[in-house]
Amino acid sequence: MVLNMLKHRKWDRHKKGGLNFTELGFGSAPLGNLYKSIFDEEANDTLNRAWDLGVRYYDTAPLYGLGLSETRLNRFLRSKNKNDYILSSKVGRIMKPCKAEDQTGIGKWFDVPFRKELYDYSYDGVMRSFEFSLERLGVSKIDILYVHDLCIFTHGSKTASDERISEFFDKKGYEAMLSLRDQNVISAIGGGINEWEVCQYLAER
């Protein structure tokens, strides 16, 4: 079987059973019509091909297609046994309905819902983002939840990035993620970040 050709890793830091996932994962930003529009059928065919090749780790985020990526994953994964795959998404942004001219990522995301991103790394922001993701994904839990884009690349300067990192801790966004893990609606937390220095800082903090 092709599945046996993909290496698996076991992650069990807290000795609670852990997560077993393929080293090769599926990053689903393109499912959000990144840089070009694709049809639902093409998105589903791509996901089916990845599944047939043995991929069992699927990563998404509210930002990807302003929710479209999560919705497309919902349509695909609803026919799969939840025990057969690992799913991750991210927090740090709320996607708010808006007029077409105010939409986030014009020229980057094509044919997506009219929504604009609002950065929110607070406790309430994390909880709201997570609930919206559950709804779009059609699931009751997510295996891995990442805090998204606490970095200079996204926020434009070290000062702005540091302010967002402070918000994440001071306004209890980090506590929200720990709370979700304690409630067993997520199994692991991490960072989806573009710079290693921030990853190291978060790990040491």
Predicted segments — roles?
Residues 67, 75, 90, 104, ...:
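Flexible domain-boundary/linker segments
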Residues 42-44, 73-76, 104-105, 161-165, ...:
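Glycine-rich, phosphate-binding/catalytic loops in enzymes
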Residues 98-108:
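Short, flexible, mixed-charge acidic loops at enzyme active sites
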Residues 109-205:
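Glycine/proline-rich, positively charged
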Residues 46-49, 79-80, 108-111, 167-169:
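Short, surface-exposed linear patches
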Residues 1-100:
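N-terminal binding-site loop/beta-alpha segment at the start of enzyme catalytic domains
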